[in-house]
Amino acid sequence: MTNRAGRPRPSRLFGKCGVSLNIFDIMGPVMVGPSSSHTAGAARIGRVARHLLGSQPAQAEILLHGSFASTGAGHGTDRAIVAGLLDMAPDDPNLPHSFRIAKDAGIEVSIRTVELRDAHPNTAVLHLTDRSGQTLSVSASSLGGGRIRVNSIDGMGAAFSGELPTVIIRNEDRPGIVSEVSRALSRRGANIATMQLYRDRRGGLAVMVMECDDPLPDGLREELAAIDGVVRCTCLELEGG
């Protein structure tokens, strides 16, 4: 089966309720095994968290919930998350050696289990600190097939996968910042596919998450970070998964 350009088109299967599944959703991603949920997804969680922090962490506390906690050791979930923190993709052949590589890099890693309320069974919470003392807390879940969902950043809600080029901004909650950010994206030709807004309280801290259709233009992060009231800006574009 081909598309209009004559290129092969992935076959699709239809399950109950008419849900359409791409054959690649069933086969899963290219990865170091054994599990797309417990290994590939876990590596992606660690990698997204590292990019949200903005640098390699010096300390990492990793909390594993549900099946991540009960079967994660056998599936290499802990090693996969640490590999992601080292910026390894799920198919990196060094993934099984991530503990040693992290130790050689001087990263302090602690791993323990936790029971979270109303959380997806494949959920991890990461508390990270870089060498400058900057901190980050991220909750994320592995949904299967190497796909993930970030649930919260520093305790504030979020819901994004990291599959699209994504801008994440932490800012003061006051009038005008959202419009300034939107104008900056428009000036540089970045089209927003989805936009989410969260805040801890009125007048407190807020999070903007904007998924974009195309690669993010050069210099965008610096322009957004310079907007008055923006506390931290991350432009998330992961190569290699």
Regions found by a protein language model. Give the residues of each.
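N-terminal amphipathic/hydrophobic targeting modules at extreme N-termini
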Residues: 5-6, 10-12
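Generic N-terminal amphipathic, Lys/Arg-enriched alpha-helix
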Residues: 21-34, 233
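Conserved phosphate/anionic-ligand binding catalytic regions in large, soluble enzymes, centered on
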Residues: 28-46
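Short glycine/threonine-rich loop-to-helix capping motif typified by GTGT followed
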Residues: 71-79, 121-123, 205-211
